């Protein structure tokens, strides 16, 4: 499988793993403190062929993803589930994911809207047990996996659902299939 867009990953091990899964070009951020030079490379890549962000499903990976989204408009996102990116010792990273899971993530990329509209209200997430309650975390994980938006806490979930244009009906449908 060939990917035309540049794939942004965190480091060399991620690049090696992704290139074993698909034919592509990558850009490495080399950590969560992305400098202006790296952002400029990503901007140029976005203008020429497009960019897909595929970072580790952890806090530093989310920080990188957020920084890129804030500074480079129109990037696409691919997410690998946390459980699928864990090694036997519990370390999380794209470099630990199965090749098939990397391909799967890259076949289901999503693009946030530049102008996020709020079609979902926080009260809906509370009503559906996604923010408050003993089972909220598990329900968020299920929803995030089904909608392919990456691991999220309650606040991040609301922001992602609105950024990707999901409706209340989409959320209810995904949870019904639980």
Curated annotation (Swiss-Prot):
Residues 4-100 form the Toprim domain. Binds two Mg(2+) per subunit. GO terms for molecular function: metal ion binding; ribonuclease M5 activity; rRNA binding. It is an enzyme of class 3 (hydrolase). It catalyses: Endonucleolytic cleavage of RNA, removing 21 and 42 nucleotides, respectively, from the 5'- and 3'-termini of a 5S-rRNA precursor. Pfam families: DUF4093, Toprim. Mg(2+) 2 binds at residues 56, 58. Keywords: Cytoplasm, Endonuclease, Hydrolase, Magnesium, Metal-binding, Nuclease, Ribosome biogenesis, RNA-binding, rRNA processing, rRNA-binding. Disulfide bonds: none annotated. Its cofactor is Mg(2+). PROSITE patterns: TOPRIM (PS50880). Belongs to the ribonuclease M5 family. Required for correct processing of both the 5' and 3' ends of 5S rRNA precursor. Cleaves both sides of a double-stranded region yielding mature 5S rRNA in one step. PANTHER family: RIBONUCLEASE M5. This is Ribonuclease M5. It comes from Staphylococcus aureus (strain NCTC 8325 / PS 47).
């Amino acid at each position: 499988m060939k990917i035309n867009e540049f794939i942004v990953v965190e480091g060399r091990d991620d690049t090696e793993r992704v290139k074993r899964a698909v034919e592509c070009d990558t850009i490495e951020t080399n950590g969560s403190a992305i400098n202006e030079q790296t952002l400029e490379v990503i901007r140029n890549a976005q203008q020429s062929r497009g960019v897909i962000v595929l970072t580790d499903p952890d806090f530093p990976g989310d920080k990188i993803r957020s920084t890129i989204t804030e500074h480079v408009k129109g990037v696409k996102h691919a997410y690998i589930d946390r459980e699928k990116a864990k090694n036997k010792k519990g370390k999380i990273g794209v470099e630990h994911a199965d090749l098939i899971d990397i391909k799967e993530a890259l076949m289901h990329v999503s693009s946030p809207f530049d102008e996020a509209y709020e079609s979902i209200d926080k009260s809906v997430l509370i009503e559906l047990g996604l923010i408050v309650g003993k089972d909220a975390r598990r329900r968020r994980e299920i929803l995030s996996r089904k909608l392919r938006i990456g691991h999220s806490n309650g606040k991040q979930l609301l922001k992602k659902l609105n950024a990707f244009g999901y409706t209340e009906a989409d959320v209810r449908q995904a949870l019904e299939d639980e």
